[in-house]
């Protein structure tokens, strides 16, 4: 019976084909020595004193402030630059004043001076043409002096009037320019004050956050 089972099993088993497997070359592995890093030896937390931790947090806070706060010289330069950054109001007013004086000189003062020179020349010609009589010469001289005095008084009055008018106009324009500059100064100071408050608030929040982080890192977690 056993022989029959062996014969039947030998008949039913399929023929297996032998496959040749080529061996893969094996390269030797290089063994690099591993560096063993020893953790820093910290003192046990039970030996730390609370006063030491507080002093460490206090000394660390100015260091963080020194890195966060800008240099005072740079802040002063920025503030000066923002305070004195004005428009061209005053130079424009001065240019208008100079242009007005130039126009008055060309339109009014120069023709008036030429007219007075011609009048003086004509009076001198009349005086030279008069006969050498004492009475007539005295009368003509008195008339000429009176005319000259009247002309000079008229010219001085006109000049004073024009100077007052131009001075009032220039003062009004200067006052307007000063008002504009004061408004701009107030706006600039307000914006600087707001920026200062915002910076202080942000620095306070950063300082509190940094101090909390330092305390959390140094103090033991309960």
From Swiss-Prot:
Intracellular or extracellular location(s) = Plastid, Chloroplast thylakoid membrane
- Keyword Transmembrane helix among UniProt keywords: yes
Topology class, membrane: Single-pass membrane protein
What GO biological process term is on the record, naming one? proton motive force-driven ATP synthesis
A GO term, aspect molecular function: ATP binding
User: Which keywords describe this protein according to UniProt?
Assistant: ATP-binding, CF(0), Chloroplast, Hydrogen ion transport, Ion transport, Membrane, Nucleotide-binding, Plastid, Thylakoid, Transit peptide, Transmembrane, Transmembrane helix, Transport
Instruction: Respond yes or no to whether keyword Ion transport is given for this record.
Output: yes
Could you list the residue ranges that cross the membrane?
83-103
Q: Which GO terms describe its cellular component?
A: chloroplast thylakoid membrane; proton-transporting ATP synthase complex
Question: Matching PANTHER family, A to Z?
Answer: ATP SYNTHASE SUBUNIT B', CHLOROPLASTIC (PTHR33445:SF2)
Question: Anything else of interest in the record?
Answer: In plastids the F-type ATPase is also known as CF(1)CF(0).
The record's function comment reads: F(1)F(0) ATP synthase produces ATP from ADP in the presence of a proton or sodium gradient. F-type ATPases consist of two structural domains, F(1) containing the extramembraneous catalytic core and F(0) containing the membrane proton channel, linked together by a central stalk and a peripheral stalk. During catalysis, ATP synthesis in the catalytic domain of F(1) is coupled via a rotary mechanism of the central stalk subunits to proton translocation. Component of the F(0) channel, it forms part of the peripheral stalk, linking F(1) to F(0). The b'-subunit is a diverged and duplicated form of b found in plants and photosynthetic bacteria.
Q: How does this chain assemble?
A: F-type ATPases have 2 components, F(1) - the catalytic core - and F(0) - the membrane proton channel. F(1) has five subunits: alpha(3), beta(3), gamma(1), delta(1), epsilon(1). F(0) has four main subunits: a(1), b(1), b'(1) and c(10-14). The alpha and beta chains form an alternating ring which encloses part of the gamma chain. F(1) is attached to F(0) by a central stalk formed by the gamma and epsilon chains, while a peripheral stalk is formed by the delta, b and b' chains.
> What is the protein named?
ATP synthase subunit b', chloroplastic
Organism for this UniProt entry: Spinacia oleracea
| Gene, per the UniProt record | ATPF2
